Swiss-Prot record:
GO terms for molecular function: structural constituent of ribosome. This is Large ribosomal subunit protein uL29m. Keywords: Mitochondrion, Ribonucleoprotein, Ribosomal protein, Transit peptide. The keyword Mitochondrion applies. Component of the mitochondrial large ribosomal subunit. Mature mitochondrial ribosomes consist of a small (37S) and a large (54S) subunit. The 37S subunit contains at least 33 different proteins and 1 molecule of RNA (15S). The 54S subunit contains at least 45 different proteins and 1 molecule of RNA (21S).
Length: 299
């Protein structure tokens, strides 16, 4: 339908032009100047030096040849070992993966170009690509190991938290003749779960980490809860929770009664402050160092 309409319109316009008597003619063609033909060549194209496709060439926009020979390839290189990759951070593995992928893309482009040129000497390109494939497989294996380890830690953390909850309940409900045994278990627990040494002189101040802080909080609050349960009258005078490591540390260094009095004194003097995270480790190292020195002097 539309095709026939357009043909009629064209036919009418032709008739109108013919009836008008207008004549169209070219001028003197001898005066028309023709430019010399432009021979197609890559020099006629201005390619940006930052063009993303330069990434498919080994030297970027400084690459002198589109296809390297086998002698130009680095065949003396070796694959990254598992031991080397396991020491790398996630960021380093990410970078290494994409550097390897980039080199494989460069080799793949050269091999495809060689095939189009019927050039068959690409065995060394393939051999180098196999090394890169091996590196990528090893990176994936290392990441898989980390994922499995993380999942196991998560499972262990859940089991650990369940055990701590059950231990806390048994500790708080222990009778007077049972509490001695539970205190011994608490010492073993704080070392096994949090790395808190039983003896003050055995502390390595450089080993103080987030697990140590978590263990300190668990032990201190557990002892306070037990004390307040045994001394209900103190509940109105002593509020929980403890205000960070400043109030928790005394329960690791002294018996519960002395620690309670020390925390009360800190609160009354206004010295009980919640430290910023960046100040927690330095405070603990300094306080424990002073406590160790004092213990050595007392001996």
């Amino acid at each position: 339908m539309s095709l026939r309409v357009s043909m009629r319109a064209f036919s009418l316009s032709s008739r109108v032009c013919a009836r008008s008597g207008s004549k169209f003619s070219f001028g003197d063609l001898s005066k028309v100047k023709l430019r010399a033909p432009i021979i197609p060549t890559h020099k006629n194209f201005d390619v940006s030096p930052d063009h993303p496709l330069w990434a498919f060439f080994p030297e970027g926009n400084n690459t002198e040849t589109a296809l390297r020979s086998g002698d130009e390839l680095d065949m003396n290189s070796r694959e990254w070992t598992f031991a080397e990759l396991r020491r790398k951070s996630f960021e380093d593995l990410h970078k290494l993966w994409y550097l390897t992928l980039k080199e494989r893309n460069i080799l793949a482009r050269e091999v495809r170009l060689a095939e189009s040129l019927r050039y068959s000497r690409t065995q060394q390109h393939d051999a180098l690509d196999e090394k890169l494939v091996t590196v990528q497989k090893r990176i994936k294996q290392v990441l898989l190991e980390r994922q499995v380890a993380h999942e196991r830690v998560q499972t262990f953390t859940q089991q650990q938290q369940q055990y701590l909850t059950e231990f806390e309940e048994r500790y708080l409900n222990a009778s007077e003749h049972e509490i001695v045994s539970f205190n011994e278990k608490l010492v073993r627990l704080q070392y096994a779960f949090f790395g808190i040494e039983p003896q003050l002189q055995d502390y390595d101040l450089e080993d103080i980490n987030i697990k140590f802080v978590e263990g300190l909080s668990f032990v201190a609050n557990l002892k306070v809860k037990r004390y307040l349960k045994q001394n209900p009258a103190q509940e109105q005078e002593f509020e929980l929770p403890l205000n960070g490591v400043v109030e928790e540390l005394p329960f690791l260094l002294r018996n519960v009664t002395e620690a309670i009095e020390e925390v009360k004194a800190l609160r009354q003097s206004g010295e009980s402050v919640k430290l910023d995270k960046i100040d927690v480790f330095p405070f603990l190292r300094s306080a424990l160092s002073n406590a160790i020195e004092q213990e050595e002097l007392d001996q």
